Amino acid sequence: MKEIEKLQVGAYYRMDDAEIAEIQNKAIALCQKIDTVSILDHSIREQLFRKLFGSVGKNPSIKPGFRCDLGVNIHIGDNFLTNYNVMILDMATVTIGDNVWI
């Protein structure tokens, strides 16, 4: 079983796995890119959220400073909002429902 598969089923896995590191690096780069896009440019920011997260509902709003482990394990519902400097550790699945503000 590959390390990423172990991670996905909640089993012990090696943090130094190249595939996991690649996903983490992509998440870091996307979080940095999101921070460079104006908070007023909703469409571009939403496109980036959709690249970062496993699934995204309607009308997501994430203030600057957002960070996560992998991104792909985060699933957010409609009307999701985070305030500044939020970190979600998603080495396991994180599901956030509709109308949630953090």
Region locations from a protein language model:
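Terminal amphipathic alpha-helical/low-complexity segments used for targeting or macromolecular assembly
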Residues: 1-59
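Secondary-structure boundary/capping motif
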Residues: 16, 71-72
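A structural motif detector for beta-strand N-caps
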Residues: 58-68, 74, 78-86, 94, ...
